[in-house]
């Protein structure tokens, strides 16, 4: 039998039918639903007189529009309130395996909530009307975002039409140095291959450095696969995966668990499997990263200086660099560790899990917010993450440092709720996109790890966390 990649196995086991042009009908196991991309899909079902094909495939929560402060006042923005209320109404009418509404303890960012509930399992196909659905590939699952029309199609038929991507293996060999996190690995890779480097591919991450990562770190890495242009990212199943899933609310139990684990252990690329493209990186080469421009590929080590567009020979790239520097209000040659910040945001589906908050708290402990920093928002990814952080006393560390301890939600990752930047504000952010206006009109976003964000909060500028005793 021909050796198969992990992607081959996941894809082939879910093909319902294939056409001559390579288009397939792909079966979907788990459909994650939130308030932004579902209203039109539910409306389409109503107009056609259809029901959900498989109610028990749907897990839902509200996240993009929910406020992260003043919950006693409810949702103040009328459009946001309408979207959340509409989701409530639609789930009540159509049903779901589980629904975590606004202010429920289980509510949170869909890509944090799904895994912590055991709704994401190895071997699954997982879709959501959100581009960062690639997060769930950390479990040895095939996961990617879909558009609103596909959301309706999945609801009605449990399938989507798709064409198989090419396969890419990105190996990170060796051990990561102290202070280097999965976020740094992701940004480093994007800096090396570019935001179009993964276009048309499904990426499998492998190598010693990847195998040593926790599940939460693997989720961070796969979350960022879309920023490299890939359709999906994934990590092979190992004991770390199985240990994380065990005893989660929606994980199998008893004999079903044993059978599942037996199958899950096959979800690795076979020895001798051929990938369409491969990259190998050395973990020793990766330092803490900071983006300087308006694309995740505009990223450098913290010890670097803002690059000079005049040194770029490609005229298109040079023009892009010039525009980015103008928007970001930066001058070529400025050391990254001399750039001051106004706002710090620690949260998002990339970095709002308990390990992320622990990293940030370790830096913030016994320190205070720098005088030039206007606000530091700490936004847990779910009510359960918030509860665990408070059990560990992390909230007290943040509050004593002068940070804001918020309620769960997508928050300042995107300007769709009350948490947003104003024109010219510079933000150290643990989110995933630094596009123009992403965090608010005229806002300037620098992507970093949770520890690097916390360091910026207490020093007032980008700082190498390895220099902080």
Swiss-Prot record:
What does the entry comment about cofactor binding?
Answer: Binds 1 [4Fe-4S] cluster per subunit.
Checking InterPro entries in the record gives: 3-IsopropMal_deHydase_lsu, Acnase/IPM_dHydase_lsu_aba_1/3, Acoase/IPM_deHydtase_lsu_aba, Aconitase_4Fe-4S_BS, Aconitase_4Fe-4S_dom, IPM_dehydratase_rel_enz, IPMI_cat
What family does the Swiss-Prot or TrEMBL record give for this protein? Belongs to the aconitase/IPM isomerase family. LeuC type 1 subfamily.
Q: Which cofactor does it need?
A: [4Fe-4S] cluster
Q: What organism is this sequence from?
A: Neisseria meningitidis serogroup B (strain ATCC BAA-335 / MC58)
Q: In which pathway does it act?
A: Amino-acid biosynthesis; L-leucine biosynthesis; L-leucine from 3-methyl-2-oxobutanoate: step 2/4
| Chain sites annotated for binding [4Fe-4S] cluster | 349, 410, 413
Q: List the disulfide bonds.
A: none
Q: What does this protein do?
A: Catalyzes the isomerization between 2-isopropylmalate and 3-isopropylmalate, via the formation of 2-isopropylmaleate.
* One of the record's GO molecular function terms: 3-isopropylmalate dehydratase activity
Enzyme class comes to lyase
Write the protein's name. 3-isopropylmalate dehydratase large subunit
* Keyword annotations from UniProtKB, A to Z: 4Fe-4S, Amino-acid biosynthesis, Branched-chain amino acid biosynthesis, Iron, Iron-sulfur, Leucine biosynthesis, Lyase, Metal-binding
């Amino acid at each position: 039998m021909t050796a198969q990649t992990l992607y081959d196995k996941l894809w082939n086991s879910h093909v319902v039918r294939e056409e001559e042009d390579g288009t397939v009908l792909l079966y979907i196991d788990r459909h994650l639903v939130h308030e932004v991309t579902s209203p039109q899909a539910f409306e389409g079902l109503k107009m056609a007189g259809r029901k959900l094909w498989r109610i028990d495939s749907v897990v839902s929560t509200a996240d993009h529009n929910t406020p992260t402060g003043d919950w006693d006042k409810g949702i103040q923005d009328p459009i946001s309130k309408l979207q959340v209320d509409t989701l409530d109404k639609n789930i009540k009418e159509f049903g779901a395996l589980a629904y975590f509404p606004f202010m429920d303890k289980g509510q949170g960012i869909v890509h944090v909530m799904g895994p912590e509930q055991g709704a994401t399992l190895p071997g699954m196909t997982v879709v959501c009307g959100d581009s960062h659905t690639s997060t769930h590939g950390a479990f040895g699952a095939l996961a990617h975002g879909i558009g609103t029309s596909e959301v309706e199609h999945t609801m009605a038929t449990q399938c989507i039409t798709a064409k198989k991507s090419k396969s890419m293996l990105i190996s990170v060999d060796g051990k990561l140095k102290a202070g280097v996190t999965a976020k740094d690995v992701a940004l480093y890779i994007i800096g090396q291959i570019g935001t179009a480097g993964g276009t048309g591919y499904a990426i499998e991450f492998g190598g010693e450095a990847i195998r040593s990562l926790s599940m939460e770190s693997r989720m961070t890495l796969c979350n960022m696969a879309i920023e490299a242009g890939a359709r999906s990212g994934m990590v092979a199943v190992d004991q770390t995966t199985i240990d994380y899933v065990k005893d989660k609310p929606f994980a199998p139990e008893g004999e079903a668990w044993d059978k599942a684990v037996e199958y899950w252990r096959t979800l690795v690329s076979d020895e001798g499997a051929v990938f369409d493209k491969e990259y190998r990186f050395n973990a020793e080469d990766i330092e803490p990263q900071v983006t300087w421009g308006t694309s995740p590929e505009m990223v450098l080590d913290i010890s670097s200086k803002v690059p000079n567009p005049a040194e770029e020979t490609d005229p298109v790239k040079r023009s892009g660099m010039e525009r980015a520097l103008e928007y970001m209000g930066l001058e070529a040659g400025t050391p990254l560790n001399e750039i001051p910040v106004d706002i710090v945001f620690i949260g998002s589906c990339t970095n709002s899990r308990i390990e992320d908050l622990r990293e940030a708290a370790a830096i913030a402990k016994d320190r205070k917010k720098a005088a030039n920093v206007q606000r530091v928002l700490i936004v847990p990814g779910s009510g359960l993450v918030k509860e665990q952080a408070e059990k560990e006393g992390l909230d007290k560390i943040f509050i004593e440092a002068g940070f804001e301890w918020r309620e769960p939600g997508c928050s300042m990752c995107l300007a769709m709720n009350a948490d947003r930047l104003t024109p010219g504000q510079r933000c150290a952010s643990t989110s995933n996109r630094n596009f123009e206006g992403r965090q608010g009109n005229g806002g300037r976003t620098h992507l970093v790890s949770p520890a690097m964000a916390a360091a910026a909060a207490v020093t007032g500028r980008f700082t190498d966390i390895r220099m902080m005793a």
